[in-house]
Amino acid sequence: MTTLFDESPEWAGAVTDAGIPTWAMTQEGPAKRHRDTEAGEREASGRHTDPEALLGGLNTQQREAVIHEGGPLLIVAGAGSGKTRVLAHRIAYLLGHRGVLPGQILAITFTNKAAGEMRERVAGLVGPRAKAMWVMTFHSACVRILRREASKVGLKSNFSIYDATDSQRLMSLVLRDMDLDPKRYNPRAFSHQVSNLKNELVDEETYAARVGSEETGTHQERLLAEAYRTYQRRLRQANALDFDDLIMTTVNILQAFPDVAEHYRRRFRHILVDEYQDTNHAQYVLVRELVGGPGTSGYAADTPSVVPPGELVVVGDADQSIYAFRGATIRNIEEFEKDYPDARVILLEQNYRST
């Protein structure tokens, strides 16, 4: 089974044993190699892209997905329907025809392998400008944001990232200090429950308040609450975050600091998410906060200076969710139109692998 960070693209360099790009583990990263300023992006001229050439060979539905402009777009794409090609051509169309800067694009995939493939495809269409885009996993994108915003939550920018093994080892120490028998109270089970809570954006204080009395929680739940609080405290003492913290903490910052949310909404005017059916609740909220609009941090439609919502394009297939064990819920794809009432849906139905 692959990890969220497996097979990093060439520019990411080596990965740790846990599969995290080594640049994500330290303060220095690809930002040093790929400066994201507008001046730098404009200097990277790239090659001219003919819109008709980009659209050539696409069927009607694929063309519509590539040139869509305006409100949110859900692309429902079955296996072999050419969704990767559509995403790559859409990004190239944004860069070559609509005048979008590479740094204004955030494309989220579920593996670094997919991110590398996407970047290579776009580079093949528009040239080296593709290097300035953010094409990466949810976790990698959050690492880059958190390196910049760490002080907002009392962290140093060189915070460590605990992988699953590190997290379980810390949980074992926490349970030992609570005098709990590891044979009866399995550290892995506790870690899994904490992960589930974070995927639902339930922090340690919220959970403790929820189960803090005999009327509202069981003895087991109160033990979990104590373990969760102690675990988080020890993470912070070590200037560290675990995998699930990367997303939850980024969401917390975006929601608590409207100026930070506005900064990234102004930056990322085009957000594309692949395999949307595999997103969990925390990832869904992260996308919503980055896009902006009603119900998000700092948004007020009657404020003249408010940043309008970015263009959101998500691709998914409700029949293919493979990350349920990580808290993914196909509710996010099934209720997309409810969450975004002005959304358009395009079906990619032709299977090119079987023709």
Range-by-range predicted roles:
Residues 1-52, 297-305:
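Acidic, low-complexity intrinsically disordered tails
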Residues 3-6, 13-14, 18, 23-24, ...:
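Basic/charged alpha-beta structural segments of nucleotide/phosphate-handling enzymes
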Residues 51-67, 71-76, 85-87, 99, ...:
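Conserved helicase NTPase motor core
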Residues 81-82:
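ATP-binding Walker
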Residues 88-92:
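A conserved segment at the C-terminal end of the G1
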Residues 93, 102, 341:
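Phosphodiester-processing cores and adjacent nucleic acid-binding clamps
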Residues 102-193, 198, 202-208, 215, ...:
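Conserved P-loop NTPase-based nucleic-acid remodeling module centered on helicase motor cores
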Residues 340, 345-346:
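Interdomain hinge/linker at the junction between the two RecA-like core domains of SF2 helicases
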